[in-house]
């Protein structure tokens, strides 16, 4: 036998590989899809598929499983199709996820017997293109333009709303802290536009629900649209997606949210449902703001102390509340109480004149040297340092979530040159993210809540096994010991209980 490599082992194809799977834990998500009513929500809201071929529910679930399994692109659906065990279990339980009318329609939707368990890449691409409006004006460089949301895409967001209502029903929270932040998705699509960082990109504006650890809403945008553009409109749309039992909302944003209409809307209680919305938002460091910072007495500056696990750590930053009333705040009809906080961070080891080359504003303080100033505006009560740390909670989490969407899931590799198809792909990646959030929080337990997809694939989803049919039952026999099996069985029992209503 010819040596295959340096060491004494050989690779061979296994002719008896039928039923083998490397995704032994992935079918656990079928249980949660059934319990959450996700299939019914897809059936009720998504209307993209035609009268022939694959159903909308089959398409949506295929993309969700592609994301969970680690796929990056439409072509990776073939990885699921070639997994004999997963394909077998998908075919076997598909009927339990379809309505009676859908099951009856399957035969008439296909001219000959269906051979695949999952849609082909070409079928999936064609379905995604149905989310695009061919009559929508084309975006052009130099102008911020956001295409209207198509009815098909709106349907996907209604499905996401239904999933979050299920999560909220079993993990209720009367308040919602919303973090608004944009992220750049680099692309080489011909019609994509350049972002502020000078590469081609799309830039969705996202609204994260901190208490539920889930994405509430996202507006897909071209890369040349500024993050703060029409942020109030996106906030209003996000608020409409919150469950009825949520009574209070708070908002956090970086300086992209420093928009007069947004601040006045929140501060003056203009929202008909939530009234005053508490917020902390990064403020622009304008010349007027810098003057107010310089006018603040040294006695007002306090060290910014970080508290971790009951211990206090003095940072090199200081903060102070500054007397500053910008024009928009002076026009407030309700005389809302806006507070401005300043943070200063010392800049060390700078040569004379180097501050002119820095990509951020600097400020010299008498006797204190050169500093990098930051600003924020809030209508929250309480100590200023507490508000600062509350705002900063969003920063690391936003970066983590965006990384998960673009690297752990398939959101970072867009499938099409059509805006609407890419918007649907992004929405489906978010749907997969939120389904996984529900799995961790409601079924797997607290120890799994902080785990990212890499850990879930290693310990749960990517388990080796064999799928067999015996006595009219389908069985997934897992390899790799009993710990993973115990985790899955416990999760299945919890999901079974979820299907019968909220705890308590």
Residue ranges and their predicted role:
Residues 225-288:
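Domain-level cores of phosphate- or acyl-group-handling catalytic modules
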Residues 80, 92-96, 249-252, 443-453:
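Short, glycine/acidic-rich hinge or "gate" loops at secondary-structure transitions
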Residues 48-51, 181, 249-258, 420:
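Conserved short loop/turn motifs at secondary-structure junctions
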Residues 2-11, 15, 275-407, 493-504:
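An anionic, glycine-rich sequence signature occurring as long contiguous blocks
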Residues 412-478, 482:
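Basic, amphipathic alpha-helical segments enriched in Lys/Arg and hydrophobic/aromatic residues
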Residues 77, 384-424, 428-439:
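Short amphipathic alpha-helical "interface-anchor" segments enriched in bulky aromatics
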Residues 1-201, 206-224, 232-244, 272, ...:
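Dynamic "connector" segments at or just before major functional cores
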